[in-house]
């Protein structure tokens, strides 16, 4: 590792901590319905939306109604996205005359963007028209992110309310998340990206003659507007196949820094929002501290692993670390940092090829997703995911001292623990179940570019990314097949909604409880001891579940690499 690289990582971390309070405080005001500096402009628009859609702003929903609204909206979103892809050939803004998307790929993509996964089993430049990119994919980057934020706010209300039967109104939370948070921030980010050289046009693709005399086609499109929400909403789907390694998406080191900040901005801010809503900001800082510890631990593995490089190559006299699959303009430090950031959050955008990482370098992003995307995590999903582990942590602490566990003045009882464990187990069952079924299929074996432990890792990473709603990939797996499109799409939906429903049920139960007065025996949940316990529970429950599978993949590949044994 270099001093310059370490300083860049520390500077990035400091920026995130500095922005958490102002962004989090703003979001707390938005969801409390308080006046903000955007109120004068956007409040009339908000009211008009409610009138147009027949939404009663004052009406609140029980957890069942909240979950029902979320599922209904997501179903409509999925069908709309699928339909647009299937008829794009006859729609305007298709200067390249791209054909309709195949049925299985359309299903996979619709499930992907509805669930905030943005898994892409296609090459965007040659598959999706401008109209599809804008009204089917980019809009769902907003919608899926807003839905995640809404669920997180509803879950927090489970702690902030007592003796209550409702968690808020999904349609109101969804509208406010989109209108006051995602749209203004995305507009500012898009303008900044344009200033850095990210393109924004509706031009046909440009044909140029290279210095060698060959003709090359250079894709165009409305990239900056999609790039902004792709990062801010932790969506991750690239306008181009190279994603954020493409100079039209991520042209400068400053743009690269801004993209990483956008990925963590809302997840970090929501921890402060949580603290404000429960009237104890120390609780939010404790969650942010736990997230930061896990984040820096990941960086401290990936960066030195990539800087050390492949020992087989080093023995040949080639020094300089592992630069395979990395952009020279970013280097190893920023590539390693981006890798950890995008997999800590459920973003999935990449500025380097994850399949070309060293075994230990590839292990960390895989584990990050398998932890449940709780290390900052996606917009909304990171907060409610970490709160699930916080409930487990206080439950375990209560068992150790023989007390009924409490968290934020609420007793954690049988129902809450069952719902929390159901949410936690869904991810493991989806990842391991689909991976085990897929690895035995000949069609999956044919899709693997590599064999041996690396091939297993490609399949495991694919289903992990899908079920964890991340969207990044070990690109050696050729995923555009009927079997993979279908099963990965199912894994995305299961990983999203089978986790959310038990979570909302737990929130509804918590909201009904009375507050328990703080006593001398109450376990404090805002200090270093709780942060340590929380980190330990995340690692033990999240990571150890997958240790046998990881042992057969990146871990054994690491030892084989040091023995000089490689796989192709």
Curated annotation (Swiss-Prot):
Main localization of the protein? Answer: membrane
Keywords of this entry: Cell inner membrane, Cell membrane, Ion transport, Membrane, Potassium, Potassium transport, Transmembrane, Transmembrane helix, Transport
Q: Does the keyword Glycoprotein apply?
A: no
Task: Indicate the segments annotated as coiled coil, or none if absent.
Answer: none
Alphabetical GO CC annotations of the entry are: plasma membrane
The record ties this protein, via InterPro entries, to:
KdpA
Give one GO molecular function term. P-type potassium transmembrane transporter activity
This protein's membrane topology, according to the annotation, is: Multi-pass membrane protein
The reply on keyword S-adenosyl-L-methionine is no
Q: List S-S links within the chain.
A: none
Which residues belong to the signal peptide in this entry?
Answer: none
Short name of one Pfam family for this protein? Answer: KdpA
Subunit structure, interactors included: The system is composed of three essential subunits: KdpA, KdpB and KdpC.
- According to its UniProt entry, what is the function of this protein? Part of the high-affinity ATP-driven potassium transport (or Kdp) system, which catalyzes the hydrolysis of ATP coupled with the electrogenic transport of potassium into the cytoplasm. This subunit binds the periplasmic potassium ions and delivers the ions to the membrane domain of KdpB through an intramembrane tunnel.
> So what family is this one in?
Belongs to the KdpA family.
The name under which this protein is listed is: Potassium-transporting ATPase potassium-binding subunit
Q: Which organism is it from?
A: Solibacter usitatus (strain Ellin6076)
Please name the gene that encodes this protein: kdpA
């Amino acid at each position: 590792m270099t001093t310059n690289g370490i300083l860049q990582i520390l500077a990035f971390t400091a920026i995130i901590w500095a922005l958490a309070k102002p962004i989090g405080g703003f979001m707390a005001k938005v969801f409390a319905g308080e006046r903000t500096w955007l109120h004068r402009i956007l409040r009339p628009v908000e009211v008009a939306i409610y009138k147009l859609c027949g939404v009663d702003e004052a009406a609140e929903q029980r957890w069942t109604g909240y979950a029902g609204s979320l599922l209904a909206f997501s179903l409509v979103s999925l069908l709309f996205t699928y339909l647009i892809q299937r008829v794009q050939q006859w729609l305007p803004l298709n200067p390249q005359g791209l054909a309709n998307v195949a049925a299985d790929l359309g299903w996979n993509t619709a499930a992907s963007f509805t669930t905030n996964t943005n898994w892409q089993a296609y090459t965007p430049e040659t598959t999706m028209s401008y109209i599809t990119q804008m009204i089917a994919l980019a809009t769902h980057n907003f919608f899926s992110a807003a839905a995640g934020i809404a669920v997180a706010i509803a879950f927090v209300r489970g702690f902030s309310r007592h003796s209550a039967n409702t968690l808020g109104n999904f349609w109101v939370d969804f509208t406010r998340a989109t209108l006051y948070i995602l749209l203004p921030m995305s507009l500012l980010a898009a303008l900044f990206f344009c200033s850095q050289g990210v393109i924004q046009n509706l031009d046909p693709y440009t044909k140029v003659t290279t210095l060698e005399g060959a003709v090359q086609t250079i894709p165009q499109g409305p990239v900056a507007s999609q790039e902004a929400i792709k990062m801010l909403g932790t969506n991750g789907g690239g306008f181009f196949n190279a994603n954020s390694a493409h100079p039209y998406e991520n042209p400068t080191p400053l743009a690269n820094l801004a993209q990483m900040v956008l990925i963590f901005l809302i997840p970090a801010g929501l921890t402060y929002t949580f603290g404000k809503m429960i009237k104890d900001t120390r609780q939010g800082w404790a969650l942010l501290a736990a997230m930061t510890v896990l984040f820096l631990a990941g960086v401290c593995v990936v960066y030195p692993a990539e800087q050390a490089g492949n020992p087989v190559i080093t023995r040949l006299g080639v020094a300089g670390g592992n630069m395979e699959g990395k952009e020279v303009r970013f280097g190893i430090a920023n590539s390693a940092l981006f890798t950890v950031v995008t997999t800590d959050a459920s973003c999935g955008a990449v500025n380097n090829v994850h399949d070309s990482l060293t075994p230990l370098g590839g292990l960390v992003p895989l584990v990050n997703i398998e932890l449940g995307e709780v290390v900052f995590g996606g917009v909304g999903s990171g907060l409610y995911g970490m709160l699930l582990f916080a409930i487990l942590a206080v439950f375990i602490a209560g068992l150790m001292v023989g007390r009924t566990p409490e968290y934020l003045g609420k007793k954690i009882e049988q129902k809450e623990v069952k719902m929390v464990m159901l949410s936690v187990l869904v991810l493991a069952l989806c990842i391991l179940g689909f991976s085990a079924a897929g690895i035995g299929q000949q069609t999956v074996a044919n899709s693997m570019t590599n064999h041996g432990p690396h091939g297993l890792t490609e399949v495991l990473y694919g289903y992990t990314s899908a079920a964890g709603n991340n969207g990044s990939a070990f690109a050696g797996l050729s995923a555009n097949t009927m079997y993979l499109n279908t099963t990965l799409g199912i894994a995305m939906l299961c990983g999203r909604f089978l986790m959310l429903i038990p979570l909302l049920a737990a929130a509804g139960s918590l909201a009904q409880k009375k507050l328990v007065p703080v006593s001398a025996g109450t376990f404090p949940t805002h200090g270093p001891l709780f942060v340590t316990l929380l980190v330990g529970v995340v690692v033990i429950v999240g990571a150890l579940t997958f240790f046998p599978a990881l042992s057969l993949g990146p871990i054994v590949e690491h030892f084989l690499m040091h023995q000089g044994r490689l796989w192709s």
